[in-house]
Every structure is written in structure tokens, then in C-alpha cells.
Amino acid sequence: MIVLTLAFCISAVGVYAQKADFSGKWTLDVAKSKLGERNNIETQTLTVTQAANDIKVDTATTRKPPAGGGAPGGGGMGGGGVMGRGGDGPATYMLDGKDVKSEIAGPGGTMVPVTTNAKVDGGKLTLSRSTTFNTPNGAITATSKEIWELSADGKTLTVTTERTSPRGTDTTTKVFIKG
């Protein structure tokens, strides 16, 4: 009987893990999040659409005005968006675990190569990204890794992000509420 119960519990966890669906509209709970010193996010919303082979994330961010006044701006390059993009807007990730190479708009109207990777493992979604761009001081590489986790009831999404750049490593934890 114990073996049967254990087998049922393991299979139930496996079914949940395989069906983890991050779709929905998610609103950042700033009070529950650990955003770090460099983040000036006032509000952030993720609109997520997940299919069998990909996940689409549309990010919208409102920022606090800079210290000393000035306009708050949108996404910018401040590192607040999903995948450390800083910017807002849509992004699509393939869920097959393979690297996808593309280009994004960089400084001064240049195009910057970026490599993304996404996979669902159990009830977690891992999004990785690497960007290398040239500056007058040489090439700079920035990487980020996000781990998305749903609460048991599917109403809370926790996104832990680690970014590495010439500035060092920065880790944030964002808590989003569905609805």
C-alpha cells in the first residue's frame, strides 16, 4: 500500500511538472521582490503565452523618476526587463533546450548578436542569454539566467535572475501575481 501511494504521488508530481504552464498576465509585487540597488522599477507586467514548443513574453515596465528629477522612462538599458534585456516588448523563446542565435538593437543603432536558450525542467522554466558587443574599450559579454517557478496553486510566479557583466554579478528575485 505504501509503495502504491508513493508511486501515485511521484506520478502526480511528474504530471504537474510536465504541464507547468506559465501563461497569463503577471503583475510584479514590488514589496515581495528583491530588486537590488540598481533597479528603479515602479511597476512591471508580463504577458506570457506558452505553447508546446515556445513561450512568448511581453514585458511592460514603468520606472521611478531618477534621483534629482527627470523623466522616469520606459525599459531602457537599466536591466529591469525579462532576461536582463532592460527593454520592454515581446520576446519568444524556443523550449527545446537548444541555443537560438539572433540579433537585437544595440547602442547607436547597431545590431548586437544574442544567444538565447530556454527549457522546461520539471516545474521550472530556465531562460539563459548571452550577448557580446564591441565598445571602444573592446568586446563586452553580458549573460543572464532566469529561473521561473510557479507556486503550487499557480497564482504566484517567482523569477530569480542572475546577471553577469563587467560591472559584476547581480541577483534579483521578482515575485509576480497572476491576474
Predicted regions and their residues:
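Bacterial N-terminal signal peptides
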Residues: 2-12
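PEST-like low-complexity, intrinsically disordered acidic/proline/serine-rich tracts
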Residues: 16-179
